Swiss-Prot record:
Keywords assigned by UniProt, alphabetized: Coiled coil, Membrane, Peroxisome, Protein transport, Translocation, Transmembrane, Transmembrane helix, Transport
Keyword Protein transport: yes
Free-text function comment from the UniProt entry: Component of the PEX13-PEX14 docking complex, a translocon channel that specifically mediates the import of peroxisomal cargo proteins bound to PEX5 receptor. The PEX13-PEX14 docking complex forms a large import pore which can be opened to a diameter of about 9 nm. Mechanistically, PEX5 receptor along with cargo proteins associates with the PEX14 subunit of the PEX13-PEX14 docking complex in the cytosol, leading to the insertion of the receptor into the organelle membrane with the concomitant translocation of the cargo into the peroxisome matrix.
Protein name, as recorded: Peroxisomal membrane protein PEX14
Primary location class: membrane
Biased composition annotated in UniProt, kind: Low complexity: 7-30, 122-131, 190-209, 218-228, 409-424, 445-476, 528-542, 569-611, 628-661
Taxonomy of the source species: Eukaryota, Amoebozoa, Evosea, Eumycetozoa, Dictyostelia
Amino acid sequence: MDNDDINNNNNNNNNNNNNNNSQELDQQEQTQEEITKQRIQKRKEEAKRIMEERKKREQQPPSQRQYEDVEDDQQQQPIRPIKQLPQRQQQYDDNDEPPQQQQYEPKISQRKVPLPPMKQPTTSSTASAATGSILSPSSNFREDMVKKAVLFLNNPNVKNTALARKVAYLEKKGLTSDEVKEALKRVETGNINGSSTNNSNITQSNSISRTRNDNYGNNNNNSSNNNNNIQQQQYYQQQQQQHQQQQQMALTQIQSYQKRLEADDQRIAQLMMNNNRFSWNSFLFSVTAIVGAASGLAYLTSNYIIPFLNGGKTNKDASANMDKKITSLQEEIIKLQSTIIQQGNDFRESTKSLKTLIEQQQQQILQQQQINSVSTTTNSATSASNSSEIVEIKKELKNLINLIGNKENSNNSNNNSNNSNNNNGYSKYNGFNGVYNKSSYDDVSTNNNNKTNSPPSPNKPTTTTTTTATSTPGSNISNTNKTLPPIIKTNPYSHLSWKLPTDQPPVIPSWQQKSSNPPSDLSNANDKSSPSNSNPSTPTKPYQSSFNYGDVNSFVGGSNTLNFDEKPTTTTTTSTTPSNERPSSPSVNNNNNNNNNNNNNNNNNNNNNNNTTIASTSNESNNSKVETTSNDSDKSTSPSSSSNNTTSTTATTTTITSASTEDNKQQSDETPYSSDFLDVINQLKQGKTPPGIRTDIDDKPLENSTVTKSAKERPKKPWERDTLTSVTNNLSVEETQTINNTDSSVEK
């Protein structure tokens, strides 16, 4: 009864299990689609979470990163049990093998997936199915493709390349990511055929399942035996223990496999990240490529495409613009021609006026040259005549000195004879005090009127003396018969207070100034002359001066006073003629004798002055004229004891000349120059600048015989200035030719 109960229970259990399995399969078929969708979403979330964790780890310090890695490993060690689907139990005979059960291989992931509730297997078939499902993970791989990938990766030429390039190449060849991972694992482990261990495990599990099935059949057949039941229970316990051990071994293998997968996933993710990182080289390359393409397109469109499309319009516009430009240029050319013609006409008019001015200037220059040549010739002639005249004047002065001495002696002798012959007197003269006064002339005239002239004796010679004074500068003195005062030894002009009109020093050089010899030389010469009348001097021709020393203004205030600059020169002519007249008898009159004695005393006191007449000469055209008048009323006769009847006539001419030259200007306006040429040379040697020399021009010679012209240059004279260059430089060649042609036609 016990065995029957057990069998019935087993049958009931099997039926219940089959029913449950059928229900579960239906439910699983409905929920597989939902599970796949959930897995896809969870994988996306896990990828996001992994990226965030990596970013956080990169930002954290290295010590904290190591601590977190250790915690992650500890958390990943407990792994969920593998999902195992129940299978339907079929009735089979004792000699037949159980049919192959459908195996479902769950995809392993890092995250825990919610699984349906699992029931503990009641038979050995469930354990064999679990072990089969665990130990066959590579049923979805294509072994041929995996082996080819392993051979490719083991190639020595490929080992040195980057892993990202290897993975990309294998994916191009058609391998899935799982196959690539499997190939990489086999390359790392060195096992080309990675299914050996799995096959050995599978064979062991199959042998165990067969033994279980055999035992299970025997138990059913021998249910009546209690001993067999006890043995079966013990055997079940042993099988359960072995099964637990196998599960633990499988779990360790699965954990190691999961770790490898995680490491591979991390490597692949890093490679993908490296490929997706931003690189400046690629950015610059792309930017340059875009810019080059854009510039090329712009060039093509602007130069080829647009002109090709708008060819007709552009040609028309260009032709219209060219016509406008040509018309504007023609108008400008016409305007320029008109302006050039106007300027040419204006220039011709200006050149005509300039030509007239140039001709006038040339005429003035020629006149100045002629005047300069005439002045040089006249100056040379006057200098030669002056030198000859000075020599003649000196000779005449010597003759005058001799005559004056002879005349003084003769007057003394005549006075003595008059005193002895009783009332034989001579004419009375007034002294000359430097200024010819009218009172002296009146006195002379009264004396001449009151004088009684005795007839000359026939045996006595008659002496007539005529003195002529000539002033060479043009004067306003009338040609009247006036007596000339005698030559005095002292300076008759000491009482005058005349000075130069300015405070400047005299301009006349030293060699041209008045000599410092006093007029006392004349007295010395008079003393040396012999007082005899028997040897008269040889007659000389009266001299007429032919040069001009001044003008009428040399006399101060328009009066008849003489100037200091005038040099008195006297010329004396003596002629002796025989007289056939009878001597007149002297009249005896006491009154007249007394008067004559007084007159003789006055004559002795006045140094026996002679009767002279002043004749003024006008020197306007460098031709002097000497006009002399003799005063016959002043003739005196004296008896002589000699038998010779001779008459001695002496003519004295006094010429007063001026020391100023013809071309002298006003003395106050001239600049003072040095009086000595040697002083000027010494000043130049010492580096000084004498007066009258310009200092604003630096033309000192250098060592190389060149002259350094400073910035300060002498301003150009009007005839030296070139005023036409500024006008002619702006002319064209045609205008200059037309002007030259007009000049040649005008000259013809």
